[in-house]
Amino acid sequence: MDGNYSDSYEEIRITGTGYDVKAGVIFRPVEESPFRIGAYVNSPVFYDLSLSAAHDLSMYGGEAPATFQDKDAAGNIGNVPCYTKGDKGQTVDYDFRLNTPWKVGVSMGHTVGNYLALGATYEYAWYDHMDNRVKDGGYYDYYWGDYYESSSSDDAMNADTRANLKGVSTLKVGAEIKPTSMLSLRFGYNYVSPMFRENAYRDQSIGSNGVDIATSTDYTNWKAMNRFTCGVGFNYENLNIDVAYQYTTQKGDFYPFMSYVNENAALSNIPTSCKVDNNRHQLLMTVGYKF
């Protein structure tokens, strides 16, 4: 610490459109039984996105900046300031495309009389095969008067995605109990496996537009997510009221920037991770009336 101060600001806004295709089947293995099995496939969501970002970093104070030892072009070792004082910032506008992963899933459901319903779903998504795409041109359709943009895969970013992300499994189980015809009690649990590999990191050295336009360096290596839900539903003639509570919990390791390793260990900069918890409580209510 050198006695100086800093403050920072960052704002990111992403807008766009996307589309996907879903297909599935449901069948009953035994015609006389309410037990059913389902399967589905979900195509990637094909996003066309626009990013607008801004950031500013200010360094100020009455002391000289801290220094570190480094070699100059002539090989002489000297003290080099860790930073320069003043305001440094930039604004970024960038258009790109992103294809999310393919997803497949299977489900099972069963009912007991008219008072109990049980369900379970397993889904797998190939997050390590997302396709980051760069807009690299286009053409004009003179007949229709429209301009169509073309894009190609960002090979460097996609290689980094495969190195740091992995397939994600999602398990959902739930039950609904109807003690009376007017009242429903609901319980559920979701488990989502980690998207990030154990030693995943945000690589700021790859040759990709996604790195060139970045306005921050921090990242969080999130672990598995658990969701617990419960709810109650009330129906009376044409009126229905539903109240649901959901608790989501997830742990992660926060890093301010990636590790930088130098041949001279004294010049290496390896940050210490910080354990973080992302716990969220949600209460939802829906009121409906049938006319």
Predicted feature locations:
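Outer-membrane beta-barrel porins/channels
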Residues: 1-291
